[in-house]
């Protein structure tokens, strides 16, 4: 599979753009820049709901997200700008023709860097035969660890508890946090795990079906991009892989162009560069 990349970038940030061009040329990846939204210069707000039903859906998503501790309590303008910038790419991918419906496109933020190219071509070729909506090629946290006996017992308990539960979205998400929250072995894959609650939007593959699902979950810019990934996973309708090798990293030299600097610094303090 020959990669084509979309990179979100503020046109005013030529240093980042030049950095990305060098990284793409190093990896031999065809690329296109998508003009990012700057939430520091304007107050980015979501469009209003088009119907009562849509507003009810958004309210339920918010209520369910707040029941899981690691989701933010909404987003500020800079974070909504980040979400909207990724959504511009998702929309582009969601509109590809049927001939390209199974194609994975690489999505990058403009602080990505290339860590490893060895084995990438083989991994990409295998990805075409796997049923993932999205695949992390770079991520923070959520690395694979073999399950402990306690964790296996927890999964059995939560499956049983689900059979007796009221089947609410909150109950479903709490169950799936145990069942799907950690990286898991993919029995048919040499190069990928099933992803759990990992982090990062700097380098991921996305196909048409995955893009359409993400757009439906984050119409009101409720989530940062990687929060939308995790919410979709916990809803049980979004299949995500993660490469065993981290092919792409996140270069901290630039700070943050799309989110608040305070938020960006706190994130990288929690998840230092690999």
Can you name each region flagged by the protein language model?
Residues 1-108, 112-274:
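An acidic/histidine-cluster motif and surrounding catalytic segment
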């Amino acid at each position: 599979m020959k990669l084509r990349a979309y990179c979100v970038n503020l046109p005013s940030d030529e240093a980042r753009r030049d950095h990305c061009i060098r990284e793409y040329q190093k990896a031999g990846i065809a690329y296109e820049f998508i003009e990012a939204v700057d939430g520091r210069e304007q107050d980015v707000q979501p469009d209003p709901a088009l119907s009562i039903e849509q507003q009810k859906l958004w309210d339920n998503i918010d209520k369910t997200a707040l029941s899981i501790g690691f989701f933010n309590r909404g987003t500020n303008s800079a974070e909504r700008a980040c979400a909207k910038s990724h959504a511009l790419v998702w929309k582009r991918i969601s509109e590809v023709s049927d001939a390209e419906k199974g194609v994975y496109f690489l999505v990058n933020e403009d602080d990505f860097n290339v860590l490893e190219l060895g084995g990438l071509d083989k991994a990409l070729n295998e990805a075409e035969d796997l049923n993932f909506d999205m695949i992390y090629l770079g991520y923070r946290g959520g690395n694979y660890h073999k399950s402990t006996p306690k964790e296996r017992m927890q999964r059995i308990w939560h499956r049983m508890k689900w059979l007796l539960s009221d089947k609410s979205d909150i109950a479903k998400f709490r169950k799936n946090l145990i069942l799907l929250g950690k990286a898991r072995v993919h029995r048919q894959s040499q190069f990928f795990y099933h992803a759990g609650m990992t982090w990062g939007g700097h380098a991921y593959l996305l196909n048409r079906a995955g893009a359409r699902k993400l757009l439906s979950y984050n119409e009101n810019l409720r989530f940062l991009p990687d929060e939308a990934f995790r919410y979709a996973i916990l809803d049980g309708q979004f299949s995500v892989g993660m490469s065993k090798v981290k092919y792409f990293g996140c270069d901290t030299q630039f700070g943050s162009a799309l989110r608040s600097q305070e938020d960006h610094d706190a994130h990288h303090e929690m998840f230092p560069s690999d």
